[in-house]
């Protein structure tokens, strides 16, 4: 396997699960999404790169998921190491970056970066969890159309039934209509961690604690199988942060998400054409 060397980092593509998992476990709560992808159903489409210091110790990791749109790009560890990986090993053209502000600064010469969206990574374990009771019901593949209608994803861009079959989703119905739901982004029982996501309540039915009910139900079921549950929430969404805190979630770290476009090559010159052809993408609710 080809290895690139710079004055500060030695980088290479990696596929050994134990090597990847060992590094991710150094901050497993920050790496919750990546740990989910490590053994997830889409793992064949996930590429990994790592950087090492002069002694051969790993210093940074980058994960690129080719199976989603936009393609997630997760950065962890030394910013200069992440930059070296993206310069020599993993070179996605367009991606949705998740990392820290320092990571963004380190790769700014390689990628054109959109304005950052600041997120809080909140986490809970069994000891801290404070469940919130309510009429939340487990959703199944039979509820796929109702869930897509709530998320307004439509039939072309909506979730397939497998999302509800493989994940854990709960919802609240009012007079038969699904008005609130929450589910999972990733579950890794082997690593003992899961990620809650896609929390949404219809605008006409907010103010009734429905989001807290469905999030509580999903979290409770997850904690029966894993030690830690994580989620992301917009840092400026104070009501949501407070609601999750009442369930026992605490803030583990702050991170940023943003679209990133490779600067080099003809791809960048084609940006106006790509933008004109781009299918609108609605960010998942958080």
Q: Predicted segment positions?
A:
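Conserved active-site alpha-helix within GNAT-family acetyltransferase domains
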Residues: 102-115, 212, 235-253
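…primarily DNA-binding HTH/wHTH and HhH modules…
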Residues: 240-242, 246-286
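Conserved donor-binding loop and adjoining core beta-sheet/short helix segment
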Residues: 2, 6-11, 22-88, 182-197
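A conserved beta-strand-loop-helix scaffold within acyl/acetyltransferase catalytic domains
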Residues: 65, 158-200
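Short amphipathic alpha-helix that is part of the acyltransferase structural core
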Residues: 2-33, 119-121, 125-158, 272-286
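Acyl-donor-binding surface of acyltransferase catalytic domains
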Residues: 48, 54-133, 258
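Conserved beta-strand-loop-alpha-helix junction that forms the acyl-donor binding cleft
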Residues: 98-104, 221-222, 231-241, 257-269
